[in-house]
Amino acid sequence: MEVELKFLVEDQIARERILSDKHLAEIMDKGSLEEIDMSAVYFDTADLDLCNNEIAFRVRRENGQPIATLKWGGKVENGLHMRGELNVSVNEEYAKNPSLSIFKGSEIYEEIEKAACDKPLKPLLEANCVRKQMRVDTGKSISVVSLDLGEIVTSKGNAPISELEVELYSGDEDDMIALGRELATKYNLKEGAKSKFRVGLELLGYKKENKL
């Protein structure tokens, strides 16, 4: 299960200050600050069977290492995103010709098999960004704080990525939410109601409501 807060960071000065925030520096796990180059391609059938069943499938390279990910269901409320998530490290051969069969045996496989019905998959959109992230420990929760800058790319237009994510790793969910709200208030951030995938779908003209 993925549990994260998402905020839009529209001001460059705010982006710079978040990364050097005094409170984050105090609770950051030493050596956890890192920069990750991310390049994601989302796939679906020609009929968007996965989207229509509130399932997202992507292959994302993180500093060159491809990872296949499924996300499904969940809810979004006041910038808090909760959904099912499954990640599998894959090789380059798989990344060039991805298949849902790699998730066979998982809790979601029967559902995705029923949704896609062995139809071929095609690239739908891309989300490319540079992520700067750190792991923080408040004593009550451990979270990953990430700042993403980049672009969503579709055949019908592009959109910028400039967002802050605070994702719960372990511990108390309310404590993680309090940390995220503290940062949002301090830097005047807007709640992010839409995932990168959802923004891309809307660029493509996809109208059906879902929580992806």
Show which residues each predicted segment covers.
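Phosphate-end processing signature that detects enzymes handling 5′-triphosphorylated RNA
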Residues: 1-212
